[in-house]
């Protein structure tokens, strides 16, 4: 069975040649560069023959563009931490403005998704 066939069969409750498997972790040493992260995730998937790729972007990407000050280590053993929150009380919510999904930290995740789609082995969901 291919990876995709295995997953589709498992979801449908049909027999598979083996249990579909995947594992994921934050790849902090790569997650500030969309291309490096896409390459590392594909490499991890192929090394362990995982059946699908679970995207693991920078964990605080959804907050940084709104003003959170984040300490980034790029170290697999240190996760990023928020040093200062953008909102420190109820009135702070009035300062939230819409941002472009194609720029900033969020935009890097969109680029990561595009790069991952280009680099993944065909048939790997």
List each model region and its residues:
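Catalytic cores of TIM-barrel enzymes
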Residues: 1-125
């Amino acid at each position: 069975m291919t990876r995709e066939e295995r997953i589709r069969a498992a979801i449908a409750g049909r027999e598979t040649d083996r249990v579909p498997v995947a594992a994921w972790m934050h790849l902090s040493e790569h997650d500030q560069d969309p291309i490096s992260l896409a390459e590392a995730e594909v490499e991890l998937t192929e090394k362990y023959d995982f059946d699908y790729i679970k995207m693991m972007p920078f964990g605080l990407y959804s907050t940084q563009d709104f003003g959170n000050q984040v300490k980034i280590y790029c170290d697999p053993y240190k996760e990023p931490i928020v040093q200062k929150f953008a909102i420190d009380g109820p009135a702070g919510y009035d300062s939230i403005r819409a941002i472009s999904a194609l720029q900033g930290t969020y935009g890097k995740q969109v680029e990561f998704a595009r790069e991952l789609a280009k680099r993944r082995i065909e048939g790997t969901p």
